[in-house]
Amino acid sequence: MQATWMRTLARVLLLSAAIGITTGVSAQSAEPHQAILMYKGVDRDKRLLEKARQEGTVSVYTSLAPTEAKPIVEAFEAKYGIKVEMWRGQSEGVVQRVLSEARGKRHAVDVIETNGPEMESLAREQVLSEFHSPYFADLPADVIPKHRQWIPDRLNFYVVAYNTRKVRREDIPTTYEGFLDPKWKGRISLEANDSEWMGGVINTWGQARGMDFFRRLSELKPELRKGHILLMQLVASGEADVALGAYYANAASTKQRGGPVDWVPVEPVIARPQGIGIARNAPRPHAALLFTDFMLSPQAQGMLASMGRGPASKAVKSDTTALKYVMSQPSVILDEADKWLQLWEKLFMGK
């Protein structure tokens, strides 16, 4: 689902660029809230809070799970006395709603929070604004886009998840190539459209090594399961012994709930940023910036870590802090989506 959507999104953006269709903001050279969002004076925080409280509310569109979004919203409201109006959908729904409203010149949303590639697509459509936050200093330099129109607030890691009743941790290989051993045949499951993970591995290893691995993996005929959540449920139930390219967040949260699941950072660990940004025409820019600051702060980052999410901030310790990983670039994911999906379908789906 995610890979197919990413290919569709990439094609739509390419077509828009080719024929000059945009959200209608490209002709505006200056961002309307630039003075607010880029202010770095010593009174920044005091002034921002005063103005945000005058605005009273902030509208947030996110794909963060309700069980994780709700406590963060409650913490923000309790701290600042500002009401959060939250709309939640799948990542594609968030993008579609933002673009539809922008093209209709209906400026309702202040803050957008979803997957990195989707955030990058919104930046290309010029519906986001560059902004500054003092919490940028807590982020790894390689995760911050040069345009700074969106900033990573959490990281998703592709790992190996396994059922602890059927697989011993010490039996998990240290690299993905170890799963080519015939003893794993019939025990491996993959998400049905995980071409993004495949592209990250191939780009890390190089064409020769990466292509050879996925060709040989496809010959083992791994089980394909549609959706990362379903994939993790099957691992927990014992229907799948191991899942390659599983989402760390799904494995960690399942483990926290007492499921017989654990995860291993098998090399190469591919990381993908999830991001937050401020709408170019945000009706409440001060509240938008205050909420974005909060999401990047140690308080909210610590909450994400406690819920099994990978915090983007280096100021917060979590069980992903010591991971050695390769950061995928959302711009590359968008540009290469079609290529990797075609290869995935050829290898694993016989298309």
Describe these PLM feature segments.
Residues 42-53, 57-59, 63-83, 160, ...:
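Short, polar/charged alpha-helical segment
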Residues 138-142, 155-157, 184-193, 214-218, 223-225, 295-316, ...:
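Periplasmic-binding protein-like
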Residues 10-21:
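Bacterial N-terminal signal peptides
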Residues 118-121, 241-260:
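A ligand-binding cleft/hinge motif common to bilobed small-molecule-binding domains
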Residues 159-166, 202-204, 272-287, 303:
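A bilobed periplasmic-binding-protein/Venus flytrap-type ligand-binding module shared by bacterial periplasmic
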Residues 318-351:
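Extracellular/periplasmic bilobal clamshell ligand-binding domains
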Residues 59-73, 85-102, 106-239:
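Extracytoplasmic ligand-binding site segments that recognize negatively charged/polar headgroups
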